[in-house]
């Protein structure tokens, strides 16, 4: 659940015994939890995350951002290919450069052609 105290401090609470319960080993490794954590992060920070690609729990995303651009690295740590990954950015961008992949930019959305098993892709989007 999400909670904001009288001082305006925000908390996101995941009620599970992660330390002592083997059933919680994959608690965060599923589609629904990924969407929930993404939404909680947006609420906690008061702004969108720089890049989000839900529906792929074994996809790791790293970002670097400044006032005019965002650089994104996607690493697929699973044995299955990710077909047509769709990455939602925190704002609209007008130009993009791809590294190790092909795709297209549509405002705040980047559509890649595919991401190979254990593969990576990267791009830099600019205002």
Regions found by a protein language model. Give the residues of each.
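Solvent-exposed beta-hairpin/edge-strand motifs
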Residues: 87-102
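Carbohydrate-binding surface patches
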Residues: 1-15, 19-21, 54-91
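Hydrophobic, well-ordered secondary-structure elements that form the walls
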Residues: 72, 96, 118
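Generic beta-strand structural signal
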Residues: 65, 104-106
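A short, polar/proline- and glycine-enriched secondary-structure boundary/capping micro-motif
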Residues: 23-26, 83-84, 107-109
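Glycan-recognition and catalytic regions of carbohydrate-active enzymes
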Residues: 28-71
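Small side chains
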Residues: 85, 103, 121-125
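C-terminal beta-strand-rich structural cap/linker in extracellular carbohydrate-active enzymes
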Residues: 108-127
């Amino acid at each position: 659940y999400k909670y904001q105290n009288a001082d305006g401090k925000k908390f996101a609470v995941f009620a599970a015994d992660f330390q002592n319960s083997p059933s919680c080993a994959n608690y965060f490794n599923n589609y629904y939890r990924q969407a929930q954590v993404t939404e909680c992060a947006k609420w906690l920070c008061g702004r969108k995350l720089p890049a989000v690609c839900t529906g792929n729990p074994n996809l790791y995303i790293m970002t670097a951002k400044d006032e005019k651009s965002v650089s994104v690295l996607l690493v697929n740590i699973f044995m299955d290919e990710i077909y047509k990954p769709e990455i939602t950015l925190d704002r609209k961008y007008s130009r993009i450069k791809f590294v190790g992949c092909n795709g297209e930019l549509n405002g705040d959305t980047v559509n890649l052609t595919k991401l190979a098993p254990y593969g990576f892709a990267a791009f830099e989007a600019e205002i």
